[in-house]
């Protein structure tokens, strides 16, 4: 008897570069697995905006770093994510940005605002938690 095994597709950053997907969706790769989600809703984005406003106020006062909404982080060919909010010190930010303006390593702080749905929750509470831990993110906040 012959057995067959199916190897799951392992997505890469190069695949996303040529992928002509629906631009109203968010495409992320974690450990080669493709996660496709709808664009965040108004409430989700309002929460992100409020968080960034507070971080920006603090950053302007302290002069220590910068915050951003939805920056791409390309950790590797098989790990490419778009967190809701990040904060990075000026010192670290200089080392992290590539020529295209993407982060290429861990910022100090990553914040994800939970969207409804088991798949979204699993991605943020499990897959992204593991990824950010392994890649050196110092603080990971999940806002629900």
Regions found by a protein language model. Name each.
Residues 1-144:
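Gly/Pro/Ser/Thr-rich low-complexity, intrinsically disordered segments predominantly at protein N-termini
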């Amino acid at each position: 008897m012959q057995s067959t095994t199916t190897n799951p597709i392992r997505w890469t950053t190069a695949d996303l570069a040529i992928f002509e997907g629906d631009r109203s969706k968010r495409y992320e790769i974690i450990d080669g697995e493709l996660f496709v989600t709808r664009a965040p809703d108004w409430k989700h984005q309002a929460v992100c905006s409020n968080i960034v406003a507070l971080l920006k106020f603090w950053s302007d006062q302290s002069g220590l770093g910068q915050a951003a909404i939805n920056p791409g982080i390309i950790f590797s060919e098989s790990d490419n994510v778009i967190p809701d909010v990040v904060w990075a010190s000026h010192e670290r930010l200089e080392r992290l940005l590539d020529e295209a303006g993407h982060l290429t390593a861990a910022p100090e702080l990553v914040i994800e605002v939970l969207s409804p749905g088991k798949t979204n929750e699993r991605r943020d509470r499990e897959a992204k938690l593991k990824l950010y831990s392994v890649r050196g993110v110092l603080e990971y906040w999940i806002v629900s």
